[in-house]
A protein has these predicted regions:
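Extracytoplasmic Gram-positive cell-surface binding/anchoring modules and repeats
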Residues: 328
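ATP-dependent carboxylate/acyl-activation modules
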Residues: 10-200, 205-319, 331-333, 340, ...
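Short internal beta-strands
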Residues: 345-354
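Catalytic core of bacterial c-di-GMP phosphodiesterases, primarily the EAL and HD-GYP domains
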Residues: 324
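Short, small-residue-biased leader/transition segments that mark boundaries at the very start
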Residues: 1-7
């Protein structure tokens, strides 16, 4: 679950924005234009004067190709129709409002290159593979030997001799290795100078003309460092989900949206992780990570419940509270007050343990809306059956 939960500390940008940054650092990218209408796509197609273009949905998620959000076209009629289709679709719940029209490139080979943080070695790690254009996680799972990894010493960085050594592991020819070394150095600069958490090119294409070109571009930033990079922060294009997460943060919650239908309200990140694991263990899918913290204020419970029920996919709510600083009777009072303000028929499973747990349970026991559980396992099973 760590990648899902930690995503609240990361800022993603669109492919077209990442390519603009690549261009500033001298990394070759294909000609492209951002468009928001089918008419705009046709105009861009004609301006490029090329036979083929690729139309790519611009949304802050992966899997665009599998969802039908990436299309190669070779005439204006297809370009117009495919753009209409893409602009009308939703990918992983995110509406597509803009597309990137790119010149189609004749590709001889595809490679994968990325820089990210390896928390085990506490260093930046360079990952490369000759199996580019594919899901790199799938490559790592099925054929891990195809991925080359190098840890970067932060005191040394990536001087010429190291860049060339790494480049030769993919390109034995001197000319191509030289081009690759330069790209590796510039990607590393992007990573370090912008406080990125991930810089990825997939694929990095070797064209039939012998040039190396970033066909796709992805950059993820650590939002804890954005105060140092106002120009990066200006690129932020929040999705509706991220707006909800930002609103939750303002209210003092840790909230991350997920794809399931069991809403979770928990106090403490560790208990939240354990609750989600328990739900998964018995075949359920959490709809969110929501940590209300250690406050004993019923108002926070009211706000948290409103936040959970904004998600139309939530079919049941599981509340798992360990009363230490948080008093279980205050949580119960907050729940009663919340449903005086909220018109919802969603069933609510409540597990209260710790400070004033018996008082909290008694407050809720007379209301059929609430189903009381005494253990985390019981709560998870009740949520699945609700």
């Amino acid at each position: 679950w760590s990648s899902d939960v930690c995503s609240s500390d990361l800022m993603k940008i669109h492919e077209y924005q990442a390519k603009e940054i690549f261009s500033k650092y001298g990394i070759p990218v294909e000609r492209h234009t951002l468009c928001r209408t089918a008419a705009g796509v046709l105009a861009a197609y004609r301006r490029m004067g090329t036979d083929r273009v690729v139309i790519k949905a611009q949304v802050l998620t992966g899997g665009r190709g599998k969802a039908g959000g990436v299309k190669l076209v070779n005439n204006t009629e297809d370009a117009y129709q495919e753009t209409k289709n893409i602009l009308g679709m939703s990918i992983k719940g995110l509406p597509v409002n803009q597309v990137l029209v790119s010149e189609a490139v004749d590709i001889a080979a595809e490679y994968y290159v990325s820089y990210t943080i390896d928390r085990n070695t506490r260093s930046v790690v360079l990952m490369m593979s000759a199996s580019g254009g594919m899901d790199i996680e799938e490559v790592a799972r099925q054929t891990p030997e195809k991925i080359i990894r190098y840890s970067i010493n932060p005191f040394i960085g990536l001087p010429d001799y190291l860049a060339r050594r790494f480049a030769f592991s993919l390109f034995p020819q001197m000319e191509q290795a030289g081009k690759m070394a330069a790209i590796l150095q510039e990607l590393y600069k992007i990573f370090v100078e912008n406080d990125a958490s991930l810089v990825e090119v997939n694929p990095l294409a070797l064209t039939k003309k012998g040039t190396l070109m970033a066909i796709d571009a992805k950059i993820v930033f650590d939002d804890n460092a954005l105060y140092r990079h106002p120009e990066v922060h200006a690129l932020f294009d929040p999705t509706e989900e991220e707006k909800v997460e930002a609103d939750a943060k303002d209210k003092g919650f840790s909230y991350v949206h997920m794809d399931g239908n069991i809403g979770c309200m928990v106090n403490g990140a560790g208990l939240a992780m354990a609750t989600m694991d328990m739900i998964k263990l018995y075949g359920g899918q959490p709809a969110n990570f929501l940590d209300i913290g250690g406050s004993s204020n019923p108002v926070k419970v009211i706000e948290a419940m409103k936040l959970l029920l904004q998600d139309e996919k939530v079919k049941v709510v599981l509340i798992n509270i360990f009363g230490g600083i948080t008093r279980c009777d205050d949580v119960a009072m907050g729940l009663l007050q919340a449903f005086e303000q909220i018109n919802s028929n969603v069933p609510v499973i409540v597990r209260l343990t710790g400070t004033n747990e018996h008082i909290g349970r008694e407050l809720l026991r007379n209301y059929s809306r609430f189903q009381i559980a005494t253990t985390m396992k019981e709560a998870a099973l009740m949520a699945l059956k609700a």
